[in-house]
């Protein structure tokens, strides 16, 4: 029991350290894409910049709006970072925290709970900008979870279950990225929207909503939202690697190296998209999901069901 707690604690600490360096990589990559250097003052090559930013935020005085609900105001960022870390329990890592038979269902359940942290933060701030940003974030997140859920069902038809280890075994010969490329493209775009990344970062919308649902947060509470957002980005890309790009189960070291390299490649694509595309209009964002992704995903799902019935191959664990 104690060893499990220590293992979980160390895993969460490593995730937060990875998130810290992810922010540095983002600033560096965007800097070079815009023909500038990025952070290069604090430490060698700017490697200590994330820690300097974290210390700066956490030593700031915590301020709350005078009419805010203090309990919910503090609960919202704590809930956000807690859910972002709990999601990692389901991943089939070399030193996995648990062995889940319904890992994908667990991910859907926990990610849907993150909506409450967004809505609570906007409502507890007692600010119209924060509330409007929270409502946008909730509508966007719920909308894209519909297609993400249907894509997961389409993938489980091939794997035969919701256990993530089944996907690793399934992709020993060929990645699902190739036969399922339409679903992969929609999945990648949906993860951009699910994590509120550009060009779907309408929840922040500086030109319209000042800063979105976290406009009233500062110091350590804002840092918790920031850590939760980047932990979710890291997790969604890791999940994409497991679902579509497979990994070898030859050894733990090879698995870790392979998964890290593929995850970093997907994160680079996230940053490339951010540097290349302007923000969508909100109605375009909703039309993309409800009028494009949803019908296509349903059609592919029905096609896969019909093919499995036609050839008499029915997954045993669905």
UniProtKB/Swiss-Prot annotation:
Keywords: Electron transport, Membrane, Mitochondrion, Mitochondrion inner membrane, NAD, Respiratory chain, Translocase, Transmembrane, Transmembrane helix, Transport, Ubiquinone
Documented EC number(s): 7.1.1.2
Subcellular location(s) per record: Mitochondrion inner membrane
Any single Gene Ontology cellular-component annotation: mitochondrial inner membrane
Membrane-related topology note: Multi-pass membrane protein
Top-tier EC class: translocase
Signal peptide: none
Main subcellular localisation: mitochondrion
Catalytic activity: a ubiquinone + NADH + 5 H(+)(in) = a ubiquinol + NAD(+) + 4 H(+)(out)
GO biological process per UniProt: aerobic respiration
A Pfam short name: NADHdh
PANTHER family xref list: NADH DEHYDROGENASE SUBUNIT 1, NADH-UBIQUINONE OXIDOREDUCTASE CHAIN 1
Name of this protein: NADH-ubiquinone oxidoreductase chain 1
Gene from which the chain derives: MT-ND1
């Amino acid at each position: 029991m104690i060893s499990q707690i220590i293992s979980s604690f160390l895993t969460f600490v490593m995730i937060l350290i990875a998130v810290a360096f992810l922010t540095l990589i983002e600033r560096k990559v965007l800097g070079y894409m815009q023909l500038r250097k990025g952070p290069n003052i604090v430490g060698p090559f700017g490697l200590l910049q994330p820690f300097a930013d974290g210390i700066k935020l956490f030593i700031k005085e915590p301020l709350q709006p005078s009419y805010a609900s203090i309990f919910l105001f503090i609960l919202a960022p704590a809930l956000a970072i807690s859910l972002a870390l709990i999601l990692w329990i389901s991943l089939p890592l070399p030193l996995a925290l648990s062995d889940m038979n319904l890992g994908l269902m667990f991910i859907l359940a926990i990610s849907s709970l993150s909506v409450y942290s967004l809505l609570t933060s906007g409502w507890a701030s007692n600010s119209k900008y924060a509330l409007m940003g929270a409502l946008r974030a909730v509508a966007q997140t719920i909308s894209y979870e519909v297609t993400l859920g249907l894509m997961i069902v389409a993938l489980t038809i091939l794997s035969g279950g919701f256990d993530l280890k089944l996907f690793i075994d399934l992709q020993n010969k060929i990645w699902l990225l190739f036969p399922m490329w339409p679903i992969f493209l929609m999945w990648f775009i949906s993860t951009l929207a699910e994590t509120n990344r550009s060009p779907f970062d309408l929840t922040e919308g500086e030109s319209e909503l000042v800063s979105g649902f976290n406009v009233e947060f500062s110091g350590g509470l804002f840092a918790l939202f920031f850590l939760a957002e980047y932990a979710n980005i890291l997790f969604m890309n890791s999940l994409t690697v497991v679902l579509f790009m497979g990994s070898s189960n030859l050894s733990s070291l090879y698995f870790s190296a392979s998964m890290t390299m593929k995850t970093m490649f997907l994160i680079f694509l996230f940053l490339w998209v951010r540097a290349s595309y302007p923000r969508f209009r909100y109605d375009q964002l909703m039309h993309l999901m409800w009028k494009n992704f949803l019908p296509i995903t349903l059609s592919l799902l029905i096609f896969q069901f019909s093919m499995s019935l036609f050839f008499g191959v029915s997954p045993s664990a669905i």
